[in-house]
Amino acid sequence: MFLKDLCEINGASGNEDRVRSYIQEQLKSPEEPGQVDVLGNLFFEKKGNGTSDKTILLMAHTDEVGLMVTNIQDDGLLAVSPIGGVDPRVLLGKRVWVGENNLPGVIGYKAIHLQKEDFKTLPDWDKVRVDIGAQKKEEAQKSVNLGDYVHFYSPFEEYENRYVGKALDDRAGCALLMALYRELPVLNHRVVFAFVVQEEIGLRGSGSTLKRYKPDAAIVVEGTTAGDNPELKRERWSTHLDNGPAISYLQSGYALDYRLFEAIVAFANQKGILYQLKGRTVGGTDGTRLASTYFGVPCAGVNIPSRYIHSPVSVISKKDFENTKQFIADILTEEILLKALEVKV
Amino acid sequence: MDTFAALKSLSLAYGPPGREKEVRGLFKGYVNGLVDEVFEDTSGNLIVKRYGQHKGTVFFSAHMDEVCFLVSKVLPEGFLRLEGIGADVKLLPSQKVWIHTRSGKRLRGVIGMLAPHLQTEETRKKLNGFEDLFVDVSMSDFSEISVGDFVTYDNEPFSTGDFFFGKSLDDRACGVIIVKMLERLTALRHDFDVFAAFSSREEIGAFGARTAAYALQPDIGIALDVTHAIDTSPNYPKNEFGKGPVIAVGAIPHRKISNLLIETAKQNGIPYQIEPSPSRTGTDTDQIQLETVAAGVVSLPLRYMHTPYEQICVKDIDETARLLALFVSALKEGVV
């Protein structure tokens, strides 16, 4: 299963090689072996039948948040810093993978019995230490180097209605694109599937796609924040699991193209598709980069609602995943984006 | 017994205070062939007896129970609120857990945490308490979950080098020491009869050890428990990994017992460490002594106590078992 495999592969920003290789291995054919650019982005092209010279871009990012070893202490413990947005509170007492060889380690924490004033203090990065069982610096240095990546250890689980695992942001998007690449018939126009690097550290990979393919419009697919936690009032939720694909209208750095947005919403209404509008504007996506690079590509966001992202365990709804996939397939087949862009700004 | 395999099974087993059946079953298997009598008492202790020459009795206890949580409320849409015994709430966000329903089902849950994107300046600084934390059980049919169901950590123990990481090594790793001591005793002569309790309900007050000590009335009683490794407090010695068992000296451990343990270690070249214990030890021994027993405590260094990944050094298990077997075999009539 694509999603399970993708979530269990480790690939924090800048270390996406294994994710990319997996996707390429699974999708490649003699006609389309896939293209990799110098940054590590991977592209698969599905040519049109010749009746249209337009190109639609689908995009998901291959990287995940993680940690990097920034110091090896005299006592053998490893200090780490976050790669992307990681809250230190989700790390304590968790198991991790250290380095290229996936050395097991634990983010240990002082026993409750030994805590004094620190019992009431917020754990910060100065307290997050990875223990690989080394008792001295020299011992740790045998198997760990400064700059080694540290990834969450989190076996993927499948339930009747849910998927649970790390990195659903955005391996859920990657798995969805992979499935669409396999399942979509040949359309009138070209479709480019872009699996891009380094989203989590500032949308760094996606821009290069535009130079290569000059798409007319794009859909970015993200495992996006849910926030439907009991502590938040309903009106502060971002999205809600099981309520269908989440369409975004404004996000950090970009108001998504209103023509595409309106057309997608109208299409969903017309077809009677269960969907939701993303209730919060927090978080950027590669859409921001696409809209602000080179000539600026009109961009839409159709997302899979995900709980507890950027932590070792995130949760999505199986139904949402399937519905989002089908919805995007229908948008492409019925050329909703291209029709919308025929309207002049 | 394969120590690593046993530690793994024991770490994964379910056994909050008073619910130690699974752990009891495992130990029953491990002591098979090493003892003359095995029985379970009404407190939930697993008691074993290995007879020597009936010149006296020495008793060991190691507790089977683990720290845990309880469901305090079931919210609609598949969220639970929790209460806890003995665990640090700070370690719970993004922790996977098992919910053990009264009907005997084991369901998975995830302690959710608001993504950084949705945090505010205020929530970023907030120390979560049980009033904030919740378990997401929306992935399971949660209709059978009810208030009072036990909740335990769901994680995967592992070993690296001489170290083993996992939950509930406090105090099941000491249960392994008892088994390994019994293995060694099969090759040694011992005058004393050896009793041992894999005890229940230590984490809420050492009830199990008390009732076992009452029933058995031993001459000598030694609790095997874990102690903090690499505590950086300047007021206590740093118990280190790989440096052998930690022998308690102080008010509750009987001087003769502590001395005899130290002597045995010295004579046999077993490394050992000393832990001063001015008042209560926080182990089963505090209860065992009350039955007018010459008490002792031998501890296994453990780091990250009560967290999902406690750490121990497997070499320390072997050295402690060796010390205890030799200690038992050195006991002579009238020693206390």
Q: What label would you give each PLM region?
A:
Chain B
Residues M1-V336:
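N-terminal hydrophobic/helix-forming segments and targeting peptides
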